[in-house]
Amino acid sequence: MGSGPLSLPLALSPPRLLLLLLLSLLPVARASEAEHRLFERLFEDYNEIIRPVANVSDPVIIHFEVSMSQLVKVDEVNQIMETNLWLKQIWNDYKLKWNPSDYGGAEFMRVPAQKIWKPDIVLYNNAVGDFQVDDKTKALLKYTGEVTWIPPAIFKSSCKIDVTYFPFDYQNCTMKFGSWSYDKAKIDLVLIGSSMNLKDYWESGEWAIIKAPGYKHDIKYNCCEEIYPDITYSLYIRRLPLFYTINLIIPCLLISFLTVLVFYLPSDCGEKVTLCISVLLSLTVFLLVITETIPSTSLVIPLIGEYLLFTMIFVTLSIVITVFVLNVHYRTPTTHTMPSWVKTVFLNLLPRVMFMTRPTSNEGNAQKPRPLYGAELSNLNCFSRAESKGCKEGYPCQDGMCGYCHHRRIKISNFSANLTRSSSSESVDAVLSLSALSPEIKEAIQSVKYIAENMKAQNEAKEIQDDWKYVAMVIDRIFLWVFTLVCILGTAGLFLQPLMAREDA
């Protein structure tokens, strides 16, 4: 039974378990006791205000590097760039050296940053908040006296935003770090690497970092005689334009191309001006949206603002031209007389240039009125009741075969030759001039003459109205092509500017 699986646990009595626990905690206690002694020894007479140099004339060499964690936001309106950075600072403090063998082999020690001397490195072009970083993080001490402090900080730095090519713009935002109170004789900065550390960078959804080189400068300011060193990072960023392309540029392009269709819309539908004004109102709404996303500056006009302004002028001109076209379209002979040059240019020349064909008129194929001949004039007389009573037989004349009609036909035959060479109205006048015609026939012929002249006047007026409508159609077609070319060339010219500027740079 003692050889069973429960024999080992049963052999460990409570005193033995307590002894094993104490033995396992002994190294930890030794390490904690060693670190405690080390901490007490290091900071027994340590003053965090005094520079850690053996000779007062020696500068403290600060190795400095900035790591970008996140590009939080770029505020174009207030011209502020918000970033999340890690500021790596390394220097040597001769007061914080120890022999690891005297303290249980401890080579490193982490202490609160408030306990040690730190360089007062600030962001010179800070726009909002504290200029210095928070010192609540701990610093790493090495037995050689090397101190490494990497505090995180969120900075809101001033950045001059150039919105000339918005939303296809590139920005150059600088971040200038340096000691605020120590000059180069007290603190000297050394740049770690040649650019900002982007290994832990979290990609932004709106901006892409092209490069971030760093430079060291020694500057003498007007306030002081000493030289102050600083390390400046130039952050070159490019805006990702996908959001603005989908939500702003493409709708504006589609709306602007609707302006071209105004000139293809027939004038008789009565919706040309309505379409123009609708496009103008839509662009106005887009302009109001854009003004909230660009800086409130009068130095430059952003690219999207130029395009909207171009399109609004474009639409306004289309409204003016449409009103003029409608004025031409509804002109009549009673209000306007078409000049000869208008007929030549807009009815003959420009339609051929614009490849416009007008349906041919059927007036040439229509049967012209035939003048009345002598026999027909005599028959008109014989058909009258008054003259039919004059027939010798006393019966109505049929087909003009009675003797009396035959006598009248010979009498008026002398007028036939002249009447055949006259117009229809002249023939009617000739008929009316014959005293032999009865009053009923004269009245009927006068009525026919009135109707014919009225119809002829209406046809002539309709032809003139059709000419004015065709002139308006030609003007519409001209501006259709003109506005199409201007819209395409203007759009391409505006949005190719960032590409050309990038190549020049």
From Swiss-Prot:
Q: What is its main location?
A: membrane
Which keywords does the record carry?
Cell membrane, Disease variant, Disulfide bond, Endoplasmic reticulum, Glycoprotein, Golgi apparatus, Ion channel, Ion transport, Ligand-gated ion channel, Membrane, Phosphoprotein, Receptor, Signal, Synapse, Transmembrane, Transmembrane helix, Transport, Ubl conjugation
Q: How does it sit in the membrane?
A: Multi-pass membrane protein
According to the UniProt topology, which residue ranges lie Cytoplasmic? 267-268, 327-474
The record's GO molecular-function terms, alphabetically, read:
acetylcholine binding; acetylcholine receptor activity; acetylcholine-gated monoatomic cation-selective channel activity; ligand-gated monoatomic ion channel activity
Q: InterPro entries from the xrefs?
A: Neur_chan_lig-bd, Neur_chan_lig-bd_sf, Neur_channel, Neuro-gated_channel_TM_sf, Neuro_actylchol_rec, Neurotrans-gated_channel_TM, Neurotransmitter_ion_chnl_CS, Nicotinic_acetylcholine_rcpt
* Activity regulation, per record: Activated by a myriad of ligands such as acetylcholine, cytisine, nicotine, choline and epibatidine. The heteropentamer CHRNA3:CHRNB2 activity is blocked by alpha-conotoxins ImI, ImII, PnIA, GID and MII. The heteropentamer CHRNA3:CHRNB4 activity is blocked by the alpha-conotoxin ImI and AuIB.
Pfam families per UniProt: Neur_chan_LBD (PF02931), Neur_chan_memb (PF02932)
Q: Could you tell me which cysteines form disulfide bridges?
A: C159-C173, C223-C224
Extracellular side: which ranges?
32-250, 286-307, 494-505
Annotated GO biological processes are: acetylcholine receptor signaling pathway; behavioral response to nicotine; excitatory postsynaptic potential; locomotory behavior; membrane depolarization; monoatomic ion transmembrane transport; monoatomic ion transport; nervous system development
Where in or outside the cell it occurs: the entry states: Synaptic cell membrane; Cell membrane; Endoplasmic reticulum; Golgi apparatus
Report the catalytic activity.
Ca(2+)(in) = Ca(2+)(out); K(+)(in) = K(+)(out); Na(+)(in) = Na(+)(out)
Domain of life, per UniProt, equals Eukaryota
Check the UniProt entry and state the signal peptide residues, or none: 1-31
Function of the molecule? Component of neuronal acetylcholine receptors (nAChRs) that function as pentameric, ligand-gated cation channels with high calcium permeability among other activities. nAChRs are excitatory neurotrasnmitter receptors formed by a collection of nAChR subunits known to mediate synaptic transmission in the nervous system and the neuromuscular junction. Each nAchR subunit confers differential attributes to channel properties, including activation, deactivation and desensitization kinetics, pH sensitivity, cation permeability, and binding to allosteric modulators.
Q: Which disease is it linked to?
A: Bladder dysfunction, autonomic, with impaired pupillary reflex and secondary CAKUT: An autosomal recessive disease characterized by impaired innervation and autonomic dysfunction of the urinary bladder, hydronephrosis, vesicoureteral reflux, small kidneys, recurrent urinary tract infections, and progressive renal insufficiency. Additional autonomic features are impaired pupillary reflex and orthostatic hypotension. The disease manifests in utero or early childhood.
* Listed name of the protein: Neuronal acetylcholine receptor subunit alpha-3
Taxonomy of origin reads: Eukaryota, Metazoa, Chordata, Craniata, Vertebrata
